[in-house]
């Protein structure tokens, strides 16, 4: 209601943050958030299915949710959760997303913590390598969103140069202040 009459859109997340909901639940969530006013939908893939090689399931799910979005004029962003994936998984996901002509491919939720050999949890988020890979393999009409660990202006600029058309960031104020100090307008 506050944004009515502006060009600011609303994005809602489904299957968040683990992506483990069934396809039917994700489609129902998609339909509901669009009815509620979302113009973009961020959907977390079923990472377990991707890691297990259940590519037909992953493809069918992405298609079903993208179809629901497109039919209602919304844009789908498919979140890969790259911290859990190997390059071969990212390649396959880009192929699937290109096949279904999704609006965006996106690196992370921000919750993709993994346990390292020392028993500590770590998080990588968006990397220059993964952004370049996703840009190279995605349909030219598909945008790439870098999300996760974009906390500085320098990292933002690296992500943009690598091919990200959008960056999710929690340190926006700091980045804007740094940009202003550097003379960006």
Feature roles, as predicted:
Residues 1-144, 151-185:
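Alpha/beta enzyme core
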């Amino acid at each position: 209601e506050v944004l009515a009459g502006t060009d600011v859109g609303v994005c809602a997340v489904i299957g968040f943050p683990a992506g483990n909901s069934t396809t039917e639940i994700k489609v129902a969530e998609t339909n509901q958030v669009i009815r509620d006013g979302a113009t973009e939908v961020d959907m977390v893939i079923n990472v377990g299915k991707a890691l297990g090689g259940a590519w037909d399931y992953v493809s069918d799910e992405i298609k079903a949710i993208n179809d629901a979005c497109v039919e209602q004029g919304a844009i789908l962003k498919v979140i890969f959760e790259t911290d859990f994936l190997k390059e071969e998984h990212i390649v396959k996901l880009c192929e699937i997303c290109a096949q279904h002509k999704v609006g965006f491919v996106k690196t992370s939720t921000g919750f993709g913590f993994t346990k390292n050999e020392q028993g500590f949890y770590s998080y990588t988020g968006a990397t220059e390598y993964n952004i370049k890979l996703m840009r190279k393999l995605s349909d030219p009409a598909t945008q790439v969103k870098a999300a996760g660990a974009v906390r500085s202006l320098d990292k933002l600029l690296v992500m943009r140069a690598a091919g990200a058309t959008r960056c999710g960031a929690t340190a926006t104020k700091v980045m804007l202040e740094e940009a202003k100090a550097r003379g960006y307008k």
